[in-house]
UniProtKB/Swiss-Prot annotation:
The modification N-acetylmethionine is found at M1. The gene is DDC. Substrate binds at T82, H192. Keywords: Acetylation, Catecholamine biosynthesis, Decarboxylase, Lyase, Pyridoxal phosphate, Repeat. Residues 58-178 are annotated as: 2 X approximate tandem repeats. It catalyses: L-dopa + H(+) = dopamine + CO2; 5-hydroxy-L-tryptophan + H(+) = serotonin + CO2. It comes from Bos taurus (Bovine). This is Aromatic-L-amino-acid decarboxylase. PROSITE patterns: DDC_GAD_HDC_YDC. GO terms for biological process: amino acid metabolic process; carboxylic acid metabolic process; catecholamine metabolic process; dopamine biosynthetic process; serotonin biosynthetic process. Sequence repeats lie at residues 58-115, 118-178. GO terms for cellular component: cytoplasm. Pathway: Catecholamine biosynthesis; dopamine biosynthesis; dopamine from L-tyrosine: step 2/2.
Length: 487
């Protein structure tokens, strides 16, 4: 493909993408395929001779689209949103065209410097404490990670290195292995599974702190665990506080947990993967109060801030905590400015070496939407979730299972887990809408997350009517089953 054909095909692809997104409401949200459907439809080996663009596009509709779950359908209410916007897509095209691998300032100065500035822009939108911003001479700063899972792992590994070096400096005879076997990290029992995975990868034990009646980690439960473990000769070193849990969007009490971490000298990492986007709205900023106690903070613009995947924003108060843990300088990566103190080499802030020019997406989206446009988008989703909550509360067969704060509603039929499992199965089998469940205190709960950029109140109302219809069918079947047993 030469430049001339690329121009033509590029325009065709833009039309295809625009048509797909404009018509996505008409596509079934969840596919009608079985595991392994695709392999028989594709040759077992790559073609020896070039194929045409037309043939590939034809196969997209014939082979790929039938197996796609349409995350951007206005009838997709599962998981949490994955962001998408036209400005972000255009920026991603440019990122692919430039094709730099920005592991150091010298590898692509614009890639590095735009990321630093965009992370400061975003930090100011969130009203983060000044200590988290790079500024012109700050000790902190932001970095784009691939996912919140990566950010948590990076924070844990940096904290592990920091505490190990501190203990060895005080007692040089201590071996790293002896320290490692005593290290303990903590998170709420509602924390994301990636926190547990970080502990597994980091080789440290992770303890779940029981959450309160609102599914939040509180000071008393954390303090009790710390005292018990210290008395047993263990070494607490790392705490993850979650703002907006995956199960029910609950919020750990940062204003209680933060001071304890500060007093105990524990690294506090704040994971706000979903909820963090909402903090750009003044009315939701209070949910971030206490972040001043954190050593690191992370959220995903690629969830709810119209910047498509992958773009996970992470800030640290002391960049040397990261660079001290991950810095390696082989000859082939060195450059003349690396020790000048004037530049950032982001390879020392992350696990991989390579990195894409992801800040372009942020730059395009922030400029083309403006802060007010992004705030309006967040507020619309929150309004729709409360509209759905109101519909649920009007039907006495159902109950709300957790406080509705942002764009997620947790609800269920009053009754057994088996009944609610049957309801979810019937909803997803019909494939008009798509939901996923969670477990709250051993209760099977349905999650209704406002996800699509194009979702409107009418879609929410239609979804609720469908849920009611499925509920009536399930309840009727349950009644018939009970009648048969009785007879």
């Amino acid at each position: 493909m030469n430049a001339s054909e690329f121009r033509r095909r590029g325009k065709e692809m833009v039309d295809y993408v625009a048509d797909y997104l404009e018509g996505i409401e008409g596509r079934q949200v969840f596919p009608d395929v079985d595991p392994g459907y695709l392999r028989p439809l594709i040759p077992t080996t790559a073609p020896q001779e070039p194929e045409t663009f037309e043939a590939i596009i034809e196969d997209i509709e014939k082979i790929i689209m039938p197996g796609v779950t349409h995350w951007h359908s206005p009838y997709f209410f599962a998981y949490f949103p994955t962001a998408s916007s036209y400005p972000a897509m255009l920026a991603d095209m440019l990122c692919g065209a430039i094709g730099c691998i920005g592991f150091s300032w010298a590898a692509s100065p614009a890639c590095t410097e735009l990321e630093t500035v965009m992370m400061d822009w975003l930090g100011k939108m969130l009203q983060l404490p000044e200590a988290f911003l790079a500024g012109e001479a700050g000790e902190g700063g932001g970095v784009i990670q691939g996912t919140a899972s990566e950010a948590t792992l990076v924070a844990l590994l940096a904290a592990r290195t920091k505490v190990t070096r501190h203990l060895q400096a005080a007692s040089p005879e201590l071996m790293q292995a002896a320290i490692m076997e005593k290290l303990v990290a903590y998170a709420s029992d509602q924390a994301h599974s990636s926190v547990e995975k970080a502990g597994l990868i980091g080789g440290v034990r992770l303890k779940a702190i029981p959450s309160d009646g609102k599914f939040a980690m509180r000071a008393s439960a954390l303090q009790e665990a710390l005292e018990r473990d210290k008395a047993a000769g263990l070494i607490p070193f790392f705490v993850v506080a979650t703002l907006g849990t995956t199960s029910c969007c609950s919020f750990d009490n940062l204003l209680e947990v933060g001071p304890i971490c500060h007093e105990e000298g524990l690294w506090l990492h704040v994971d706000a993967a979903y909820a963090g986007s909402a903090f750009i709205c003044p009315e939701f900023r209070h949910l971030l109060n206490g972040v001043e106690f954190a050593d690191s903070f992370n959220f995903n613009p690629h969830k709810w801030l119209l910047v498509n995947f992958d773009c996970s924003a992470m800030w640290v108060k002391k960049r040397t905590d990261l660079t001290g843990a991950f810095r390696l300088d082989p000859v082939y990566l060195r450059h003349s400015h690396q020790d000048s103190g004037l530049i950032t080499d982001y390879r020392h802030w992350q696990l991989p070496l390579g990195r894409r020019f992801r800040s372009l997406k942020m730059w395009f989206v922030f400029r083309m939407y403006g802060v007010k446009g992004l705030q309006a988008y967040i507020r619309k989703h929150v309004q729709l979730s409360h509209a759905f909550e109101a519909l649920v509360r009007q039907d006495t067969r159902f109950e709300i299972c957790a406080e509705v704060i942002l764009g997620l509603v947790c609800f269920r039929l009053k009754g057994s887990n088996k009944l609610n499992e049957a309801l979810l199965e019937s909803i997803n089998s019909a494939k008009k809408i798509h939901l996923v469940p969670c477990s709250l205190r051993d209760r099977f709960v349905l999650r209704f997350a406002i996800c699509s950029r194009t979702v409107e109140l009418a879609h929410v109302q239609l979804a609720w009517e469908h849920i009611q219809e499925m509920a009536a069918t399930v309840l009727r079947a349950q009644g018939e089953e009970k009648a048969e047993i009785k007879n």
